[in-house]
């Protein structure tokens, strides 16, 4: 089939690569405009654009897609059999969704109808789920509410964070996408409506959600740290500075101390901090304008001692 691909970040690149390697033909790619990225804030192409250009696939980057006659005409000229959307970043209007023969499908990183919306991977980790998944669904006007072609479960382990789970879901989504497209082409697949009464929403992550409240349980804080490792990063005040906490582990402890208090600062083990119901061993932290370091190095470099407190 002739496929028009809509996508922007790294998550979408796996699906684009799988499409390029499949029997289907990618007739065009629509992605977000180039934006400043990285420390130097240089204008850079999106990851999807970079991949498409390697394969000489036409790339289009409209500033807006609503009421955009030019992009409508472009899509009609490309004449795709189906549009595939993977983390494009904007909601497509109905007039665009309905152009291709087989309409428009989406790779969504949750087990729908759970976690519709913008941040399904982070929310699944933050809420302590032990599994999530990917679904291929038909796009309709309502957000992530279309009929579902297929889903695959993915386990969330204690070792997973936003980076590892993102990659697992991107891989699984790409594999499932090709299977679904092959079956759509052969007319061998049915779609099923979602149970809308069971729908939950994964609202966008806000920067303020990175602030750690050490009176919460060790498990809740551990989930917060690993869910927000890319952005905004979990953080707490220490010596009047905002220190980011990038990696931690739940450990047993039976000492009485205030939440956030350092109960152990060991150059071999690291920093152990009291929480509402237990303790966390902090493994990697980052002081302002510094690189991430192990807590063993932080103890040596910043002379951190037991009795000090994260707030």
UniProtKB/Swiss-Prot annotation:
Protein name: Methionyl-tRNA formyltransferase
Binding site for (6S)-5,6,7,8-tetrahydrofolate: 110-113
GO molecular function terms attached to this record: methionyl-tRNA formyltransferase activity
Family membership noted in the UniProt record: Belongs to the Fmt family.
InterPro entries (alphabetical): Fmt, Formyl_trans_C, Formyl_transf_N, Formyl_transf_N_sf, Formyl_transferase-like_C_sf, Met-tRNA-FMT_C, Met-tRNA-FMT_N
Keyword field: Protein biosynthesis, Transferase
Pfam families documented for this protein: Formyl_trans_C (PF02911), Formyl_trans_N (PF00551)
Gene this chain is encoded by: fmt
Any single GO CC term annotated in Swiss-Prot or TrEMBL for this entry: cytosol
Annotated source species: Sulfurihydrogenibium sp. (strain YO3AOP1)
EC numbers, comma separated: 2.1.2.9
Catalytic activity: L-methionyl-tRNA(fMet) + (6R)-10-formyltetrahydrofolate = N-formyl-L-methionyl-tRNA(fMet) + (6S)-5,6,7,8-tetrahydrofolate + H(+)
Function: Attaches a formyl group to the free amino group of methionyl-tRNA(fMet). The formyl group appears to play a dual role in the initiator identity of N-formylmethionyl-tRNA by promoting its recognition by IF2 and preventing the misappropriation of this tRNA by the elongation apparatus.
